[in-house]
Amino acid sequence: MSVLPPTLRENRRYVLFRIITLVNPTQKEVYRSMADSVSALFGDAGAAKMHPAVVWSEGEYAIARCTRGYEQSLIAALAVVTKVCGEPASFRSLATSGTILSLKKKVIPESIDDTTYPGYLCAGKKVNNLSKENGHRYLTRDDIIKE
């Protein structure tokens, strides 16, 4: 069987999302949670049209794939995930793109005290409205959640 030329292949879109949970789930566990959510929200026929898959997962970030035109449906399904591995969790979509590489470039690791933390690049967005600086800012989980 020969390979289809690029013009005949199905177009896909990729969604970068953040996994907010206390456990560190594997890519397969993230996929199971996403697939359950897609099936519950859109049924088996909707899931078959969408072709959801998790193609990359590292730390608290992951990239999901779907058929072009179903990006908003996938984002809605990601938003209703409540558990991963039986633990409370939520998925927050960050960006959508046509290539995996462009989404991976948005996840930049940052080292603080010889410890590497994943970070999300917010290029072109105003982070600090008081001083109107658009420089890159990196926040870790410890910066956001202060006990």
From Swiss-Prot:
Q: Which reaction does it catalyse?
A: Endonucleolytic cleavage of RNA, removing 5'-extranucleotides from tRNA precursor
Localization, per the record, is: Cytoplasm
InterPro entries to which the protein is assigned, alphabetical: Pop5/Rpp14/Rnp2-like, Rnp2-like_sf
What is any one GO biological process for this UniProt entry? tRNA 5'-leader removal
One Gene Ontology cellular component annotation?
Answer: ribonuclease P complex
Write one Gene Ontology MF term: ribonuclease P activity
- Main location, first listed in the record: cytoplasm
Q: Any idea which UniProt keywords this protein has?
A: Cytoplasm, Endonuclease, Hydrolase, Nuclease, tRNA processing
Give the transmembrane region(s).
Answer: none
Q: What Enzyme Commission number(s) appear in the record? A: 3.1.26.5
User: In terms of domain of life, where is this protein from?
Assistant: Archaea
Give the multimer and partner information: Consists of a catalytic RNA component and at least 4-5 protein subunits.
Any idea what job this protein has? Part of ribonuclease P, a protein complex that generates mature tRNA molecules by cleaving their 5'-ends.
Its family remark reads:
Belongs to the eukaryotic/archaeal RNase P protein component 2 family.
Name of the protein in its database record: Ribonuclease P protein component 2
What is the source species? Methanocorpusculum labreanum (strain ATCC 43576 / DSM 4855 / Z)
Q: Which gene encodes it?
A: rnp2
